[in-house]
C-alpha cells in the first residue's frame, strides 16, 4: 500500500467519523495518530505529540484568540448589541424594511467587537427578533435577515477564523484584517440592498415604521459611541501600526470591561462567567488546532498535498477554474462542519495546489498563474475562503446560523427561515463573483496601508 493510498484511506475514515458525529478534534487526532504510526512508527507519533503539545500552544499569535473571545463574551453581557440595534433602528426604522436593515447594521457593529458568527446571530436574534415581529415583519424576512447578518461576524475584523487562516498559511494577521474590511463593508451594503429589493417586490414583508423624535434619535445614536471607540482603538490602532493584534485584543478586553463596570453595572459574577466561557471556548479551539496539526503531519508524510498539487499541474486546468472548484468544495464542506474546522481541514490541502498553479511560493506578479504574487494570492484566497465559509453557515440543509435563529424564533417554521435566507445567499454569491473578478476589493487597502 502506497503512502498516498494510506492518506486517502485516512481522509475517508475522517469523513466517516465526522458523519457519525465524533467531535472533529478527536476525529482528526485519531486519524492523524493512526496514520503517522502506520507510516513512520509509534515512536515518531509520540515524539510529534511531545513537540506539538508545547510548540503548538505556545505560538504567540494564537494568544490573540482567547482575548477576542473574551471581548465578545463581555460585549454580549453588557448589552452592546441592544444599544447597536436601538441606534440602527432609529436610523433605518422609518424606511420600508428598515427594521431588518437595522438588524443587519447591528450585526455588523457587533461583529466588530465579537468576531464570531454564531454568537452574533444568537445575540442579535434575541435582541432584534421581538422588535421585528412586533413590527409585523414576515417570518421569512425577520429570521432570514438575522441568520444572514450573523455571518458578518466571521469576516469583519477582529475574526477568530481569520486569525487561524493567517497562521495556517503564514500570512500577516494585520494584513488579513486590512484585507477583510472592504469585503465586509460590501457584504453589509449588499444585504441592505437585498432587503430593499425584497420589500419592493413584497411591501407587506417589511412594513414602514414610525419616524422617531429628534431627542430619541440622538439618545439612541449615543449608544453607538462606545462600540465605535472600541473598534477605532483596537482595529484602528492595528491599522495605524501602533500595536500588533495581541496587545490590541487585550486593550479591547480592558475597554469593554471598563465600560461594563463603569456604565452598565457589569457584575463580578458575569465577568467570571465570561472568563469561564472563554476558557472553555479557547480550550475547544486549541484542541481542534492540535488535532489539525496531527492530521496535517500525517497528510504531509503521506504526500497528499504534493500529490494534489502535482495533479492540478498535470490536469492543465486553468488556475481560475481550479480556484472555483476548490471554493465549491468548501461550500460542500460547510454543510458538514463548523467554519473553524473547515478552514483547518481544507486550507492545508488547497493552499499548496494554488501555490503550484501560481508558479511557486516566491512567485511575483509577472508570469504568475493568477496574475499576482503568491503573497497577494495568500490574502485574496483567504478572503474568498472566509466568504465561502460564511455561505456554509446559511446554506441548506445544515446552515448553522439558520438553526440558531430557528431555535429562537420557535413560531417560524425552519423552512420559512431557509426561504428567507435565499436572497441573502444570492447576495453572497454576487460578492464572491465581484471579488473573484476584482481582486483589488481585497488587495487595495493592504496595499495602501502596508507601508
What are these regions (language model features)?
Residues 1-451:
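Alpha-helical transmembrane segments of multi-pass membrane transport proteins
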Amino acid at each position: 500500500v502506497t503512502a498516498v493510498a494510506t492518506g486517502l484511506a485516512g481522509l475517508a475514515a475522517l469523513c466517516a467519523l465526522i458523519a457519525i458525529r465524533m467531535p472533529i478534534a478527536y476525529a482528526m487526532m485519531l486519524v492523524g495518530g493512526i496514520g503517522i504510526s502506520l507510516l513512520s512508527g509509534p515512536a515518531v507519533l509520540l515524539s510529534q505529540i511531545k513537540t506539538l503539545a508545547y510548540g503548538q500552544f505556545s505560538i504567540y499569535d494564537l494568544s490573540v484568540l482567547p482575548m477576542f473571545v473574551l471581548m465578545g463574551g463581555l460585549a454580549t453581557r453588557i448589552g452592546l448589541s441592544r444599544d447597536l440595534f436601538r441606534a440602527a433602528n432609529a436610523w433605518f426604522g422609518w424606511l420600508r424594511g428598515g427594521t431588518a436593515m437595522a438588524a443587519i447594521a447591528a450585526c455588523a457593529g457587533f461583529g466588530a467587537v465579537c468576531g464570531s458568527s454564531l454568537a452574533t446571530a444568537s445575540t442579535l436574534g434575541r435582541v432584534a427578533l421581538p422588535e421585528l415581529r412586533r413590527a409585523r415583519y414576515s417570518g421569512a424576512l425577520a429570521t432570514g435577515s438575522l441568520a444572514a447578518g450573523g455571518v458578518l461576524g466571521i469576516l469583519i475584523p477582529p475574526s477568530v477564523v481569520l486569525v487561524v487562516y493567517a497562521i495556517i498559511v503564514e500570512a500577516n494577521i494585520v494584513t488579513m484584517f486590512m484585507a477583510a474590511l472592504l469585503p465586509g463593508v460590501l457584504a453589509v451594503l449588499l444585504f441592505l440592498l437585498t432587503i430593499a429589493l425584497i420589500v419592493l417586490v413584497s411591501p407587506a414583508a417589511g412594513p414602514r415604521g414610525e419616524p422617531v423624535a429628534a431627542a430619541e434619535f440622538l439618545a439612541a445614536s449615543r449608544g453607538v459611541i462606545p462600540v465605535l471607540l472600541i473598534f477605532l482603538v483596537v482595529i484602528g490602532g492595528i491599522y495605524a501600526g501602533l500595536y500588533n493584534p495581541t496587545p490590541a485584543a487585550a486593550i479591547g478586553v480592558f475597554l469593554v470591561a471598563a465600560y461594563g463596570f463603569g456604565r452598565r453595572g457589569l457584575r463580578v459574577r458575569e465577568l467570571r462567567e465570561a472568563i469561564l466561557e472563554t476558557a472553555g471556548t479557547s480550550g475547544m479551539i486549541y484542541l481542534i488546532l492540535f488535532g489539525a496539526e496531527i492530521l496535517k503531519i500525517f497528510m504531509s508524510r503521506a504526500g497528499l498535498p504534493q500529490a494534489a498539487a502535482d495533479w492540478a499541474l498535470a490536469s492543465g486546468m486553468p488556475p481560475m477554474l481550479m480556484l472555483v472548484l476548490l471554493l465549491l468544495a468548501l461550500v460542500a464542506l460547510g454543510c458538514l462542519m463548523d467554519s473553524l474546522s473547515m478552514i483547518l481541514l481544507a486550507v492545508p490541502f488547497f493552499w499548496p495546489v494554488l501555490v503550484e498553479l501560481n508558479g511557486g511560493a516566491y512567485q511575483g506578479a509577472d508570469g504568475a498563474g493568477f496574475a499576482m504574487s503568491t503573497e497577494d494570492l495568500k490574502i485574496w484566497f483567504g478572503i474568498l475562503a472566509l466568504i465561502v465559509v460564511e455561505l456554509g453557515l446559511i446554506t441548506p440543509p445544515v446552515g448553522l446560523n439558520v438553526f440558531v435563529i430557528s431555535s429562537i424564533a420557535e413560531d417560524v417554521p425552519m423552512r420559512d427561515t431557509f426561504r428567507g435566507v435565499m436572497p441573502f445567499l444570492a447576495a453572497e454569491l454576487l460578492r464572491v463573483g465581484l471579488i473573484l473578478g476584482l481582486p483589488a476589493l481585497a488587495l487595495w487597502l493592504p496595499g495602501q496601508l502596508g507601508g
